[in-house]
Amino acid sequence: MTDAAPNQPVNESQELSKSFEPAEIETRWYDEWAKRGYFDAGRHVETGTDPQPYVIQFPPPNVTGTLHMGHAFNQTIMDGLVRYHRMLGDDTVFVPGTDHAGIATQIVVERQLDAQKVSRHDLGREKFVEKVWEWKEQSGSTITGQVRRLGASADWPREYFTMDARMSRGVAETFVRLYQQGLIYRGKRLVNWDPKLLTAVSDLEVQSEEVDGHMWHILYPFVDGPQTITDQDGNTVTLRGMTIATTRPETMLADGALCVHPDDPRYKHLLGKLVELPLCDRNIPIIADDFVDPDFGTGCVKITGAHDFNDYACALRHDIPLIVIFTLDAHINENGPKQFQGLERYEARQAVVAELQAQQYLVKVEPHKMMQPKGDRTGVVLEPMLTDQWFVAMSKPAPAGTLNPGKSITEVALEAVADGRIAFYPENWTTIYNQWLNNIQDWCISRQLWWGHQIPAWYSEDGQVFVARSEEEAQEQARAAGVSGPLTRDPDILDTWFSSALVPFTTFGWPEDTPDLRRYLPSSVLVTGFDIIFFWVARMVMLTMHMTGSVPFKHVYVHGLIRDADGQKMSKSKGNTLDPVDLIDGIDLKGLVRKRTFGLMHPKQAGAIEKATRRQYPDGIPAFGTDALRFTMAAYATLGRNINFDLKRCEGYRNFCNKLWNATRFVLMNTEGHALDGDGGELSFADRWIVSQLQALEAEVERGFADYRFDNVANALYRYVWDEYCDWYLELAKVQIQQGTPAQQLGTRRTLIRVLEAVLRLAHPVIPFITEELWQKVALVAGKRTAGAVASVSVQPYPRANPQAVDAEAEAAVAELKSQVEAVRALRGEMNLSPAQRVPLVAEGPTDVLSRNTPYLAALAKLSEVEVVAALPDAGAPVQVVGDARLMLHVEIDVAAECARLDKEIARLEGEIAKANGKLGNASFVERAPAAVVEQEKARLAQFSETLEKVRGQRVKLGV
């Protein structure tokens, strides 16, 4: 605003606007907070104090990605914690960063090149990587800009990118040290291979999907001719050969053996015998291994060590040849029979099955449901592939000279949780963490991609490997080894999760022993979804403890995943995603449809997605503002459970923001211009009650933050502000201001403004923008800041409960008053009085209580007068009993007309009950209708029955 004081983004003389307009407020205040340095670490240290550090690291989002609902949820929780601890006086460090996201980013750029009919191989590695850097520079700021929109009070000067020079140095140093310690090695292993991307993928990046497939039963004839066995029923059976069942007949071309259980009496005498491998000019042996289930199928399986994970382990145990029959793009290679060479794997399957049938090796084919592994990035069916890869040894003891000699990195990670140095919230995730680590395999960290941290290993012409921090260092190693020829760098890159796992310490300057590293490691808490506990959480624990000796964080808060209102996973292909920025700013229907149908992997889905979107959001999505979205996310943040996101909750919390805004306007209108910065004034029981309730709120909010129960924090704030402060206290305060003595008016005005000021501080971590805007006005009146001074609620002390301010007497008095008001309102409803009609009340009971409550009853229950009597008149009117008081409205009514009205209502309700009972008594309806419809009908029946009972009671009281 142009006429605001210097460095003060509010016009102190201007009245608070009539409506809450979040867009203007959010931009103005976020920039102001950042400019003033409120987000910077060490801000409090400069004052000479030494507060404890409170540190949170961003789970780094993909640099070229955009914000999704999971990010919004995570950011709300993290920023809420950071703002809370900043107000507690802690030295807060909220470290932002982005991940280079190897596979995801490379796919995006390759798609752009595909549109130009260019492949990455056409460009070559160097030019392709340049293209990716260009794309990163163009779009890399999108997601950090969106994070700012959410109000994240991050220490932006510390922002990192996982491939910047500082982080890359830490990655290379970690790799070299682990290699020198024998904990990183290169070997030929079976890995999940994506034949489209031409790279290995992590086991954790495999999505298993149930599909309808087939089971082919294939005969492998005995080389020595038919053999006899004794079957499970004791019968002697002559076999031409062994029959096996497989879902992948094309892989039989790589079979190395058949296998039975060593204790299976049917086949013991056949061990060591040879069978013909159909379609191939070779014989394979029958071996025994206890991994075979003798009761499944024929009790005999084929061993294809190079193309099946179970078979691979068995083949290694028995020294069975590992024959690779697929090229890296999943075509039959030179190891397969000539007639199949060059065929794509599924074409090969058809050809193999046809030839098996033609040569009478195919016994039968059965339909079979099976789990099919697909890459989560490409959706392509993955292939177990035997390739040279780099691995981290997860179970190998660390050597002498390391920080944990004699213990594997997995063992150290398990101990850190077992002894309490790291705690999970909720605690049950400890069990999952332990199960994963106790069944861990060596981690394949190499990827056959071009975008990422290139593995720091160089090869001489004779195959020697030199692992070094730089090419110069590798050449020094080569010269020392007597190698003088050129060196070639390993073309592979590191798994993205390798560099991400180093974030807890590389962001603070490691491998240097920096002051930041000493002060800010470990982090206070990691906030994450359960889906990356192993991807990221466990690996951070392992590598941070191995490289630094410190745990990476003290607490791990694990939250559920955001799903749509029906509990479905949000995904682009389902067309049910929501962009948090669209909830903040709003979006029209046309824009929403365009966003949901653009760039689909399967364009045919666009029509159905558009139809569903138009049905669900006929008017688009209104603008809710950041605060309403954050409040919604906080309210959803129960421990561990998945969240079914309903847009109506956003609407409810936007209404809350409006309610808080309007309440503040009312308070300011009744307090501005009054000297309220000192003490004095007489407090009513209502004033003392709202202050007492404030202590309970402050205690509940403190517990909520301590226990990571953000839902409790949000719900407590909502109840207090909406129910107690706005719906009750403001109405009671009006009576005091209108009818009280000057001393009473002063006491109430001071209570109004001081309680509101405390509420704004309490709510700030959850809804930062509206609380800042309102606090600037309220704090002036409350004496918390002086005119023209630069101040912010974000660095004010956080309210703490004061047990001395708890007032049980005032609590009881207001509870009794509430009951009396609600009783009179019930009488009004019972007598069908219009809200505008003021009527007299006759009350019998304790004179002191009723006299004290009279002005409040009259105002809140819309009464023309309140008469306290020794005994209620016998007027045949309905009476409400509240404790020792009996209340009756003195209203002349046409008894006959009222009886007729009630009789008509009774008849209507009885009809509705009969209809509901008819539906629920119909077995066909109950069995066929959706469960939700049946439950709705049961609820209707219960409501009609309850109302009928009340109406009949009213009718009986009239007695005519």
Curated annotation (Swiss-Prot):
Its main location: cytoplasm. It is found in: Cytoplasm. GO terms for biological process: valyl-tRNA aminoacylation. CDD domains: Anticodon_Ia_Val, ValRS_core. A motif ('HIGH' region) lies at residues 61-71. Signal peptide: none annotated. ATP binds at K572. Pfam families: Anticodon_1 (PF08264), tRNA-synt_1 (PF00133), Val_tRNA-synt_C (PF10458). It catalyses: tRNA(Val) + L-valine + ATP = L-valyl-tRNA(Val) + AMP + diphosphate. It is an enzyme of class 6 (ligase). One of its GO terms (molecular function) is aminoacyl-tRNA deacylase activity. SUPFAM superfamilies: Anticodon-binding domain of a subclass of class I aminoacyl-tRNA synthetases, Nucleotidylyl transferase, tRNA-binding arm, ValRS/IleRS/LeuRS editing domain. Its EC number is 6.1.1.9. GO terms for cellular component: cytosol. Keywords: Aminoacyl-tRNA synthetase, ATP-binding, Coiled coil, Cytoplasm, Ligase, Nucleotide-binding, Protein biosynthesis. InterPro entries: aa-tRNA-synth_I_CS, aa-tRNA-synth_Ia, Anticodon_Ia_Val, M/V/L/I-tRNA-synth_anticd-bd, Rossmann-like_a/b/a_fold, tRNA-bd_arm, tRNAsynth_Ia_anticodon-bd, Val-tRNA_synth_C_sf. Residues 893-958 form a coiled coil. A motif ('KMSKS' region) lies at residues 569-573. Belongs to the class-I aminoacyl-tRNA synthetase family. ValS type 1 subfamily. Monomer. HAMAP family: Val_tRNA_synth_type1. Catalyzes the attachment of valine to tRNA(Val). As ValRS can inadvertently accommodate and process structurally similar amino acids such as threonine, to avoid such errors, it has a 'posttransfer' editing activity that hydrolyzes mischarged Thr-tRNA(Val) in a tRNA-dependent manner. ValRS has two distinct active sites: one for aminoacylation and one for editing. The misactivated threonine is translocated from the active site to the editing site. This is Valine--tRNA ligase. It comes from Bordetella pertussis (strain Tohama I / ATCC BAA-589 / NCTC 13251).
